[in-house]
Design a protein with these regions (language model features):
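C-terminal flanking tails of non-heme Fe-dependent oxygenases
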Residues: 1-198
Length: 198
């Protein structure tokens, strides 16, 4: 996190102060061998909800959206880590970092992925940093609580939770952002900040 702060021209502690007991997750994702896979979609387009993701893939298949709204392959290199910017860094940076819109294409070979979803502390208020607001003349994003954002995005992503939401068994936190409202995907959908915030 300190490195991201330095890249923004800030002191490392401006972001590091929010990393004390983060609810980060390291996951193992398995994509089984699929003889019939031929450039079909595996995991749909999304951004990661946290600050950033470190990813160690074992085969090709990851695609990212570039600034023109085109899907491009991420070149696979054995043992190389991929860093995806997440929603929270986009907001903190006031858009200087853009959350990585990405998806996974089904490939014939068996594939494993080891993502570390790196979050900030659950109760952190994430909003554009004052220095970056001054640089751009205005805040491009409204504030959100990190834990509320993780919860809201999870509810809106998984079908069984969307069904519970529709039945009124659970509810979204106030100010929940729509899934896909950040990153290049959100920009290319034409969502304004006001539209993206409910």
């Amino acid at each position: 996190m300190g490195g991201f702060a330095i890249a923004l021209g800030l002191a490392p502690q401006q972001l590091l102060q929010h990393i004390n007991k983060p609810p980060s997750q390291l996951r193992l994702i398995h994509y089984p061998y699929n003889l019939n896979a031929e450039d079909t979609q595996g995991i749909g387009a999304h951004t990661d909800y946290e600050c950033f993701t470190l990813l160690l893939p074992t085969a090709p298949g990851l695609e990212v959206m570039n600034g023109k709204g085109e899907w491009i392959d991420v070149p696979f290199k054995e043992g190389a880590l991929i860093v995806n910017i997440g929603d929270m860094l986009e907001i903190w940076s006031n858009g200087e970092f853009v959350a990585t819109s990405h998806r996974v294409r089904k490939v014939k070979e068996e594939r494993y992925s080891f993502p570390l979803f790196f979050a900030c502390d659950y109760h952190t208020v994430v909003e554009p940093l004052p220095e970056l607001v001054a640089r751009h003349g205005q805040a491009r994003y409204s504030a959100l609580k990190a834990g509320d954002h993780l919860y809201a995005q999870t509810i809106q992503t998984f079908r069984y939770l969307r069904e519970r939401l529709a039945r009124g068994e659970i509810k979204l936190p106030d100010g929940a952002r729509e899934v896909g409202s950040l990153g290049q995907h959100g920009k290319n959908k034409g969502l304004s900040n006001e539209e993206a915030n409910r």
